[in-house]
Amino acid sequence: MCIPTPHNTAKKGDIAKKVLMPGDPLRAKYIAETYLENPVCFNTVRNMFGYTGTYKGEQVSVMGGGMGMPSMGIYSYELYNFYDVEKIIRIGSAGALQDDVNVMDVVIAMSACTDSNYGSQYQLPGTFAPTASYNLVARAVEVAKEQGTPVHVGTVVSSDVFYSDNPETSKAWRKMGVLCAEMECAALFMNAARAGKEALGILTISDHMFREEAISAEARQTSFNKMMEIAL
């Protein structure tokens, strides 16, 4: 496919080799305006804002990825395969599954289980294990230590279903030691693997699946600074 694509008006060279991808395009706008020097908007199609600027001398882009694996799948596929992006770091919210993972904690997704059939397109003779880039995981852990930010590192689950009809679903993933639930990492990790590129998920816990604890939608846009700074 030629660029611009139906979903992204950027031209070749408008997007950095490293892209941060929150689900919320307003969070992308917040990151660009708060952290990037001289940010330039490269996309507004469907209000999925994308910006490129510099952070501590390094060119960085930030772009919304939407909700769910189909949306993340489209945007990350185009970035990897049409815009020559090398690294995508998803920064988003997640629901905690374990007792020792609390609201506002940061989780580094080392791997992502999924109930999606996204991987069926590859026609593999088995089940693929969507995994983050080790180099990005190790670097994120190192930066978190430098900042004094405690993090949980482990497995997350990427689900196609936000409102599940099965009340036992969360309990089953919890028993397997999965740290939290979200909706995008597995597709991102699979796209990266297929393209021979790098990917990582850094998540902030916005609510707890087994306790009545949550933060507001507004706070999700603007208060996840520790996660953002690790990703940058």
Regions found by a protein language model. Give the residues of each.
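Metabolite-binding pocket within alpha/beta catalytic cores that recognizes anionic/polar moieties
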Residues: 1-128, 134-135
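Glycine-rich beta-alpha junction loops
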Residues: 25, 95, 157-161, 187, ...
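Expand to "…catalyze enediolate/carbanion chemistry for C-C bond making/breaking, isomerization
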Residues: 81, 165, 194, 202, ...
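Active-site rim beta-loop-alpha module in soluble metabolic enzymes
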Residues: 127-176
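A C-terminal functional module that forms or caps the active site or interfaces directly
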Residues: 167-206
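His/Asp/Glu-rich mid-to-C-terminal helical/loop segments that flank catalytic regions of hydrolases
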Residues: 209-232
